[in-house]
Swiss-Prot record:
InterPro entries (alphabetical): NA-bd_OB-fold, Ribosomal_uS17, Ribosomal_uS17_bact/chlr, Ribosomal_uS17_CS
Family statement: Belongs to the universal ribosomal protein uS17 family.
Function: One of the primary rRNA binding proteins, it binds specifically to the 5'-end of 16S ribosomal RNA.
Gene3D superfamilies the record matches: Nucleic acid-binding proteins (2.40.50.140)
Keyword tRNA-binding included in the entry's annotation: no
Protein name per its UniProtKB record: Small ribosomal subunit protein uS17
GO terms of biological process kind: translation
Length: 88
């Protein structure tokens, strides 16, 4: 394969659930401009990401990268925890 196909998509989002083993649910928010009115809106999507060492917990800010399918719903993997959640 060529080197251009090895570029992986990465996203940054907040972990909203870590109740599954080796899996976290990551909420990724993006800003889009309304095509007619021009207002900037926030759109969000949830991704299931593979978390091998169960290192990411709920509330953490994580970076996820696209990988080969691990299961029916998991095609993303956690690469790093950027910010830990504040425990109260």
């Amino acid at each position: 394969m060529s080197e251009s196909s090895s570029i992986k998509r990465t996203l940054i989002g907040r972990v909203v659930s870590d109740k599954m083993d080796k899996t976290v649910t990551v909420l990724v928010e993006r800003k889009v401009k309304h095509p007619m009115y021009g207002k900037v809106m926030v759109r969000s999507k949830k991704y299931h990401a593979h978390n091998e060492g169960n290192s990411a917990k709920a509330g953490d800010l994580v970076e996820i990268v696209e990988t080969r399918p691990v299961s029916r719903t998991k095609t993303w993997a956690v690469t790093s925890v950027l910010e830990k959640a504040i425990v109260v």
